[in-house]
Swiss-Prot record:
Induction notes from the record: By auxin. Repressed by miR165.
Pfam families assigned to the protein according to its UniProt record, in alphabetical order: Homeodomain, MEKHLA, START
Stored InterPro entries: HD, HD-Zip_III, Homeodomain-like_sf, MEKHLA, START-like_dom_sf, START_lipid-bd_dom
GO molecular function annotations of the record: DNA-binding transcription factor activity; lipid binding; transcription cis-regulatory region binding
GO annotations of cellular component type: nucleus
Domain START: 150-378
Protein name: Homeobox-leucine zipper protein ATHB-8
Transcription found in the keyword field: yes
Similarity section: Belongs to the HD-ZIP homeobox family. Class III subfamily.
Protein role: Probable transcription factor involved in the regulation of vascular development. May promote differentiation of precambial and cambial cells.
Length: 833
């Protein structure tokens, strides 16, 4: 028993203290309320609980310590058991995959031996084979083998379903398709699974298998609801449902997929889906198109859609010992690539792109749901994961609707101004208008937007990885965005404009990025962008005090397999309610070169993007990308009143064209060897970024005797860009030297962008008598002596704000031939007044 003196004596002799069941029960209750009580709290517990009064406070402390240790051990044991179950399941999966690969090798060896023995039959095989595997797609000619229509009566559909099931299983676990590992996939316990793409089969196909922490029934339920996880799925309508004798289900389905770009039509499918349970308890969901049937239901062609084909595909879901499921996925499509321009055909001929956008998307979504169930924590801004997931789906769907502009959703095309680079659409349907709220003006009048205008365009990019370009657009919004347009868009959901802003390239105050949530593998994340308003708006515009954008970003990981990259954003009200209106705009960049999709560039874009010059160093890893291409799609939406349609259309067209020009300029700066590829040489006065960083650092050390940059490997470029003091270069002209370069701190101090930097002269920032006198007296000293130091003072940003600095240093930057190249200034410990 636990008496006070006996407890102390036993504790001193290292013996255990025995507690009565009542005491243990009381301590457990206290532990649940407070696992780690302080000394005062423990004494209070003894007073409040008489049953513990005969136990020493020190011994109660030991009990709580031991209880926390046991809890930690229990959790660790539980975690290790879960890991062990996962590893056991993965080992089983790998053994099955190894067996399948051995069968595939045996099959290939047999085929190779056969063709070696019968070389004369190869020509006949090539000319007489009329199976689906011999479909030829070349140029604008699409040759489809002629087959007799299949019977679509209930008995005929059951026959098709059984045939589809057999073909799907042979693809998922057999050798019906030659699978090769998808480039760039990293195996391991934390990987998404085993992902493979087809080699040498009809159409495009992808296969994946992995572990999911959900039971098979729940997995099947989620996978059948494609619009919830497949962002490209516009709709999935179940037209008819039939039951089979073995307890299975036949479904006739009409499905529509969005087009990823404005340059190609969308796809639709008329298909059969068969769900059944196999003898070993596995769930199977398989599907295929019903494009050539008779004696049953059919789906006529839809305008603005190209009827594509799903070849036998589906999901094999097996229960896993200890919980969860082992999942096999096969996606096999013929997306009719003949129907799109030649330059875009690889979008519809890339199995890798299919794997990224469809097959892996299913696995990622299931893993995300599993984690949310096991860890239902509240994330940023008080949102639960399901609510944030719904917001991301609304952003994606709204952007896809804008890109596609279907007439059945109320979109109609406006007349062009003679230049077809930007397409304008307007939507005044009641459904669309429910997304906006009333617009109160400064004079007290309240208006309701009666339409939404969309300005969209697509353009081809060359030699710039999508992840690099999109990350730049996200981190340097000031390079392309106009605050007045953002403010106008924000007004549509809170306080409306009475007159239109004038787009001004480079008109941008600043931004603060507030992280919101991210997926398990960080391939997609959401954030809130807080924009600093410039305050240069008309008096009759009731602008929000703060401008917030909800933003979703994906595909910016440079080390991942190059895939589709998206930056989609929409203005939101500060209240950020779940039913807030969302009118998304944004960018989508898709690589067009399947051969280069597996490359993983590792680029530094900071300083390099500041210079309008050509190639990187010879050792740049991106040089191996060659003539890589991608297509960028841009879509911006604005709510407005119908009587302002002409003015809003003109403003939107002008703004999108300015965004396109800015993106092209940035893409050129980020492109490796862009000038060499076009047959041009950079002018001698424009060194590359790495060279300029080396010249600046070397000249500083020569004239001032100390190092400007602390040793940071060999990457002077990155060190200079992230230097805490404002570093900026200007031309050698004695009269009105023009800025040619600034690091990040320098751009922040000048309140400008890389695009507008060259419009700022040195004398503009010293826009006061003392500053100009100092500049006129010190500038010649730099040219003669090589450097100069200035005491603290005040200068001006490009926006007219006063900036104070503790000290300034100027020095002459010499090139490799010891000739002056530019003048560099560094402002130490600067701040806005």
């Amino acid at each position: 028993m636990g008496g006070g003196s006996n407890n102390s004596h036993n504790m001193d002799n290292g013996k255990y203290v025995r507690y009565t069941p009542e005491q243990v029960e009381a301590l457990e209750r206290l532990y649940n309320d407070c696992p780690k009580p302080s000394s005062m709290r423990r004494q209070q517990l003894i007073r409040e609980c008489p049953i513990l009064s005969n136990i020493e406070p020190k011994q109660i402390k030991v009990w709580f310590q031991n209880r926390r240790c046991r809890e930690k051990q229990r959790k660790e044991a539980s975690r290790l058991q879960a890991v062990n179950r996962k590893l056991t399941a993965m080992n089983k999966l790998l053994m099955e995959e190894n067996d399948r690969l051995q069968k595939q090798v045996s099959h290939l060896v047999y085929e190779n031996s056969y063709f070696r023995q019968h070389p004369q039959n190869q020509g006949n095989l090539a000319t007489t084979d009329t199976s689906c595997e011999s479909v030829v797609t070349s140029g604008q000619h699409h040759l489809t083998p002629q087959h007799q229509p299949r019977d679509a009566s209930p008995a005929g559909l059951l026959s098709i379903a059984d045939e589809t099931l057999t073909e799907f299983i042979s693809k998922a676990t057999g050798t019906a398709v030659e699978w090769v590992q998808m480039p760039g996939m990293k195996p391991g316990p934390d990987s998404i699974g085993i992902v493979a793409i087809s080699h040498g089969c009809t159409g495009i196909a992808a296969r994946a298998c992995g572990l999911v922490g959900l039971d098979p029934t729940r997995v099947a339920e989620i996978l059948k609801d494609k619009p919830c996880w497949l962002r490209d799925c516009r709709s999935l309508d179940i037209v008819n449902v039939l039951s089979t004798a073995n307890g299975g289900t036949l479904e006739l389905i009409y499905m529509q997929l969005y087009a990823p770009t404005t340059l190609a039509p969308a796809r639709d499918f008329w298909m059969l889906r068969y769900t059944s349970v196999m003898e070993d308890g596995s769930l199977v969901i398989c599907e295929r198109s019903l494009n050539n049937t008779q004696n049953g239901p059919s789906m006529p062609p839809s305008p603005h859609f190209v009827r594509a084909e799903i070849l036998p595909s589906g999901y094999l879901i097996r229960p896993c010992e200890g919980g969860g499921s082992i999942l096999h996925i096969v996606d096999h499509f013929d997306l009719e690539p003949w129907s799109v321009p030649e330059v875009l055909r690889s979008l519809y001929e890339s199995s890798t792109l299919l794997a990224q956008r469809t097959t892996m998307a299913a696995l990622r979504y299931l893993r995300q749901i599993s984690q949310e169930i096991s860890q239902p924590n509240v994330t940023g801004w008080g949102r639960r994961p399901a609510a944030l997931r719904a917001l991301s789906q609304r952003l994606s769907k709204g952007f896809n609707e804008a890109v596609n502009g279907f007439s059945d959703e109320g979109w109609s095309i406006l007349e062009s101004d003679g230049i077809d680079d930007v397409t304008l659409l307007v939507n005044s349907s009641p459904t669309k208008m429910m997304m906006t709220s009333s617009l109160p003006f400064a004079n007290g009048y309240t208006s309701m937007p009666s339409a939404v205008l969309c300005a969209k365009a697509s353009m081809l990019l060359q030699n710039v990885p999508p992840s690099i370009l999109l990350r730049f657009l996200r981190e340097h919004r000031q390079e392309w965005a106009d605050n007045s347009i953002d403010a106008y868009s924000a007004a549509a959901i809170k306080a409306g404009p009475c007159s239109l802003p004038i787009p001004r390239p480079g008109s941008f105050g600043g931004q603060v990025i507030l992280p919101l949530a991210h997926t398990i593998e960080n391939e997609e994340f959401m954030e809130v962008i807080k924009l600093e308003s410039l305050g240069h708006y008309q008096e009759d515009m009731m602008m929000p005090a703060d401008i917030f954008l909800l933003q979703m970003c994906s595909g910016v990981d440079e080390n991942a397999v190059e895939s589709c990259a998206e930056l989609i954003f929409a203005p939101i009200d500060a209240s950020f309610s779940d039913d807030a209106p969302i009118i998304p705009s944004g960018f989508r960049i898709i690589p067009l070169d399947s051969k280069s999709e597996g490359l993983s560039p590792n680029r530094t874009l900071d300083l390099a993007s500041a210079l309008d010059v050509g190639s990187r160093t010879a050792g740049d890893s991106c040089g191996s990308r060659g003539n890589s291409k991608s297509v960028m799609t841009i879509a911006f939406q604005l709510a407005f009143e119908m009587h302002m349609q002409e003015n809003v259309a003109s403003m939107a067209r002008q703004y999108v064209r300015s965004v396109i020009a800015s993106v092209q300029r940035v893409a050129l700066a980020l492109s490796p060897s862009s000038h060499q590829l076009s047959g041009l040489r950079p002018p001698p006065a424009s060194p590359e970024a790495h060279t300029l960083a080396r010249w600046i650092s070397h000249s500083y050390r020569c004239y001032l005797g100390v190092d400007l940059l602390k040793p940071h490997g060999t990457d002077l470029l990155k060190s200079l860009w992230h230097h805490p003091d404002a570093v900026m270069c200007c031309s050698l002209k004695a009269l009105s030297p023009v800025f040619t370069f600034a690091n990040q701190a320098g751009l922040d101090m000048l309140e400008t962008t890389l695009v507008a930097l060259q419009d700022i002269t040195l004398d503009k920032i010293f826009d006061n008598n003392n500053g100009k006198k100092t500049l006129s007296s010190e500038f010649p000293q730099i040219m003669q002596q090589g450097f100069m130091c200035m005491d603290g003072g005040i200068c001006m940003s490009s926006m007219g704000r006063a900036v104070t600095y503790e000290k300034a240093v100027g020095w002459k930057v010499l090139n490799d031939d010891e000739d002056p190249h530019c003048i560099c200034f560094m402002f130490l410990n600067w701040s806005f007044i």
